[in-house]
């Protein structure tokens, strides 16, 4: 990250007892952080404030994603890339064009990370139906902005909904990000839940790359055809 506190955050994280070695890099040149990377998750960018939607972030965040993906294409072109930076629906497209221009685009290795919509859906459905969130898994397809977020509520095993419940849940899931932005009153957007969602997606990706079968995550990707 360009923030000067990045190495300090890495030191803080390194004190957590895990088998993972943690390093932090700061500055405009991401090369040291990208060398030999198999998975790269991009979360850099400005956050929403009250009254803004994700598309309002485009002018700033598009340039950030473009710059980082250019460095990935040069340093670790084989890496799987997860785009978290909003607006995901367009930053993924920008990343794809940068990779195509560099001649290293692989649609099977570029993902718009929409896992936050899934964990929100799991939470909201569990609350409504009095279930443990660990027993609920809601497939959410589409993008990560407004009406492009499509929770497949009919696909949840052992749960049924009235038409009104479907309408209300869908609306809440699609507007959950705004709920957080307004609750923070100008203090930013979702960070803690997004961190959990990013970790879930990244770990699932690694498990699948290591050969584990049956690992399924929804994401915003280029389809066939």
From Swiss-Prot:
Question: Could you say which EC number(s) this protein's record lists?
Answer: 1.1.1.37
Annotated GO biological process: malate metabolic process; tricarboxylic acid cycle
One GO MF term: L-malate dehydrogenase (NAD+) activity
Give the source's domain of life in one word.
Bacteria
The UniProt record gives the binding positions of NAD(+) as 1, 61, 84-86, 194
What enzyme class is recorded for this protein?
A: oxidoreductase
- Catalytic residue list: 144 (proton acceptor)
Which residues take part in binding substrate?
A: 48, 54, 86, 120
Cellular component, GO, one term: cytoplasm
Tell me which UniProt keywords the record has, alphabetically: NAD, Oxidoreductase, Tricarboxylic acid cycle
In terms of SUPFAM superfamilies, this protein maps to:
LDH C-terminal domain-like, NAD(P)-binding Rossmann-fold domains
Its catalytic activity? (S)-malate + NAD(+) = oxaloacetate + NADH + H(+)
Q: Which PANTHER family match?
A: MALATE AND LACTATE DEHYDROGENASE, MALATE DEHYDROGENASE, MITOCHONDRIAL
Q: How does it assemble?
A: Homodimer.
Q: Which family does it belong to?
A: Belongs to the LDH/MDH superfamily. MDH type 1 family.
Described function: Catalyzes the reversible oxidation of malate to oxaloacetate.
| Protein name, as recorded | Malate dehydrogenase
At the highest ranks, the source species' classification is:
Bacteria, Pseudomonadati, Pseudomonadota, Gammaproteobacteria, Enterobacterales
